[in-house]
């Protein structure tokens, strides 16, 4: 997904411009730190105190120049209007968050308001149109059948959470003046690969290239476990 995000940024903003980035639900800060290393000014918003602690510890190991470009705040994505003025950011990330938000539309509208005109909204969501794929490919055919009629699933933490449909999000983004500009599939072939699986460098590069190509290509991207959507503020 980092390749796709970098591609969207490079295609939308002048080379060398220091962007104002808001990472909502930043988790351990992986994307926030990566973008700060690339020269951008990054604000991370995280509601989980433990994840925020881990992100702060990771930030503390970075060189001073990078630390100065990162601000970490405890808070929820629904609270962006409390912390920031409208139009404060060029890029807003919301990756792996919407599945935990029962009614995501108001939050998405708030995120769109944070963008300056022409700004980029990057979402990573679970693909509700492909929930049958994981259980079906692991032989749990009963669960696969049930998934066709559901927009919820049980995640790796054992929590029942939401998934989103592409068409519904397309309509939502249009309605909040950040229409869909591009979308990709994530984890087309690797959704059942165990977290932490280590591969030789050459094999890892092949996997990343395969996933990147599949995530841009129909019909593969439509059955990906996750969707990466990029909206642009009008």
Identify the meaning behind each predicted range.
Residues 1-17:
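Conserved alpha-helix/loop element of class I SAM-dependent methyltransferases that forms part
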Residues 17-25, 120-149:
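Conserved class I S-adenosyl-L-methionine
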Residues 30, 34-80:
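Class I SAM-dependent methyltransferase SAM/SAH-binding core
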Residues 93:
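A conserved beta-strand element that flanks and buttresses the S-adenosyl-L-methionine
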Residues 105-120:
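A short glycine-rich, Lys/Arg-flanked "PGG" loop and its adjoining helix->strand segment in the class I
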Residues 158-177, 183:
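Short alpha-helix
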Residues 182-234:
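A C-terminal cap/extension of S-adenosyl-L-methionine-dependent methyltransferases
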């Amino acid at each position: 997904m980092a390749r796709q995000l970098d591609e969207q940024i490079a295609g939308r903003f002048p080379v060398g411009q220091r962007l104002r980035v808001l990472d909502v639900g930043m988790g351990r800060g992986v994307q926030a730190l990566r973008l700060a290393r690339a020269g951008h000014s990054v604000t991370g918003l995280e509601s989980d105190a433990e994840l925020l602690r881990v992100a702060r510890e990771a930030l503390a190991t970075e060189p001073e120049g990078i630390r100065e470009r990162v601000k970490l705040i405890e808070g929820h994505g629904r609270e962006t209007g409390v912390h920031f003025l409208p139009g404060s950011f060029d890029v807003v990330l919301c990756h792996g968050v919407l599945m935990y938000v029962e009614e995501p539309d108001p939050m998405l509208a708030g995120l769109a308001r944070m963008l300056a005109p022409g700004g980029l909204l990057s979402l990573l969501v679970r693909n509700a149109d492909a929930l049958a794929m994981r259980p079906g490919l692991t032989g749990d055919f009963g669960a696969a059948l049930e998934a066709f009629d559901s927009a919820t699933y049980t995640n790796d933490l054992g929590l029942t959470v939401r998934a989103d449909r592409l068409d519904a999000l397309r309509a939502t983004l249009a309605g909040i003046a950040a229409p869909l500009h591009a979308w990709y599939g994530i984890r087309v072939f690797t959704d059942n690969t165990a977290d932490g699986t280590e591969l030789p460098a050459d094999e890892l590069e092949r996997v990343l290239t395969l996933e990147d190509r599949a995530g841009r290509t129909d019909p593969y991207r439509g059955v990906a476990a996750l969707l990466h959507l990029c909206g642009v503020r009008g």
